[in-house]
Amino acid sequence: GTELEVKVTGVYLEGLKWMKFSHDALKAEPKKNDDGEIVPNVFLLKIAPDAPLGIHKAWIGGGKFGSSNYRSFVVGDLPEIEAGAGGASMEKPFEMEVGQTALGKAPAGKYGWFKFAAKKGQRILAEISTKDIDSKLMPSTALFDASGLQLDNDPQGGLLDFTATADGDFFVRLNDFLYKGGDDYV
């Protein structure tokens, strides 16, 4: 289980009072400041230890315009790290370890670069999960070795399946297929 703060953004959110989920193991309550006043559009989400892994749905409502449509999100068991837009170049990548989930958003007109180490014979699956969470990002990915040689790519799917042929550092390049980006490209 875990707890985290969720900030809801968008239009027509005046008077937002609740956040509900597709499973009872997920609960949220409005965040309050030190004076006990509700912080607008911010909720404290509690995920129970027995919450099922996978895709869940969230709704918000209680304001002037009733309930929202649902938005999907993932409950996972891998450590999560904030990657922002990834590294700006292969020379300055965002470094991560195999077995981590990177969270971030794609910048418009740019690549995000990620670096990881792998051992010879180690199979690596790098998946960019966007369709299941209603992201506008259409992932285009490519995998490179330390010399800059492209080893694999998936121009419109977001899945790289790779077995390292030698110990070393490897790089994933990510961008939107149409080079779009911003807050909705997560």
What residue spans do the PLM features occupy?
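Short intrinsically disordered coil segments
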Residues: 60-61, 86-91, 155-158
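Predominantly extracellular/luminal regions of secreted and cell-surface proteins
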Residues: 70-98
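A short beta-strand micro-motif common to beta-rich folds, especially ectodomain repeats
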Residues: 51-62
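Acidic, Ser/Thr/Pro-rich low-complexity intrinsically disordered segments
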Residues: 2-31, 36-40, 49, 63, ...
